[in-house]
């Protein structure tokens, strides 16, 4: 029975990827212009029938990434609202009500510019150890927090740049207890942190531009002993064995126009469809969308246009659905993996739909980075001069210089929140494909920000 067409095989591990000389099966760069797409094996068509459960509410200023704990049914959000890192936290949110239960008081660092937070950007949940891992991207460090107390329990902050455990510009992090490692993307390398010893091993993505010396994308995907890493500048997806930490396969991504960069951003897989899905930002709207590849061979199957800067994606294996954010339009695509087509588009705020995660009941949780009109009052605003934390609706920037080298004086800025979207769609089979169903969420009352927790 064919794995790609049988739902009886849902969740079954796919066989090992074939290895070529030197242990890497590579899809050549010329493949992007010359290869003929493999026809999709699934012709199932579905449409959205129930779109009532779509709610949007106020979130944090400066939202970056979102993570979800299935064990506690809590959502975790990392938010940093300003470049000077005077407004930053991680928040724990109830997945049912979307009420913000707690915001952490992050560690404060003093340097020659004054005081700043050890700011949070990337985030992931470790339900085995009851922790949350956070990337402090602009401080070149990674930290771990206790889920219950929200206190920092480990960090790489403060280690020297010459230390082999130093990670430059960490962006995304995922914890894998099967291999005993936490994987981190950053500049130059993908890093693996040993969960017991905290020692760091690094790998450059061979075949990426400049020998893999540029920034790696903000997203990673783990499955069955494989780490899938999209590399934006080279347009490739690297498949890394999590135990050996060696590249086993390289897939050259494709879009609608082979003369324009694809810029892959995120990746996921579907075992029952035997497919890899990759979101890509493209350039000026060209090559923005979802590309589909055969999971076993890496062969290109189809490109589906969506938005103007398709960014993050999340997969629901049980229903063969993929959810894709578009930073350009602020919409979220509901992509049907059985038919390989977009069947729904959920509105947010007109721009900057950013990160997405799937809840255990099949609901989808999305963050944007678009500021709402009204200013908000936060309990964790740091004074960069005194180091004092206050409840405020404004913050003061540090003086600096613009890109032309001109002096920019300090200024007072209003705090404005981003939004959180939650939705779930109902489905039914249909004989023919139809235009995507548009979904507009209703507003959910915001319950306010709680006092800060931990230190």
Language-model features, listed with the residues they occupy:
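Predominantly soluble domains enriched in secretory-pathway, periplasmic, or organellar proteins
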Residues: 4-7, 26-455
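Bacterial N-terminal signal peptides
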Residues: 14-24
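Bacterial N-terminal signal peptides that target proteins for export
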Residues: 2-15
